[in-house]
Amino acid sequence: NEKGSILFTGNTGCGKTFLSNCIARELIRRYYSVVYLTATDMFDILAGSRFNGNDDDEAKDRAAYILDCDLLIIDDLGTELNNTFVSSQLFYCINERLLRKKSTIISTNLSMTMLRDTYSDRISSRIISQYSIIPLYGDDIRTKIV
């Protein structure tokens, strides 16, 4: 597949995170750098690097690694509190990683329409054109295990 990034969509418990982690495990086994973050954690890191002042080198390093790692996994996009900062940082992250030719996996419960409405046309346009969109279907497997 020429598209190096993936968007997994689907209901809760249909295997989006599991598949993301399977891909991560294989890439780590092949010595690629992989960062897994929930969307909330990623935006917290980006906010820390932006607003903690110039003295927080660790926060800046963590934010830089989000952009530079071979594979970034953003889990549960759409569960974070959305605001202008979040939307701008999501655009920056997606766009910058595309420019650097770095792969990203995003998992979300949001449909493409909801994704566009929640964030922006600029973000959804890049995802639609540059990501393999893989919808997952099925019941919540967590409730079947219990």
Regions inferred by a protein language model and the residue ranges of each:
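Walker A/P-loop nucleotide-binding motif
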Residues: 3-20
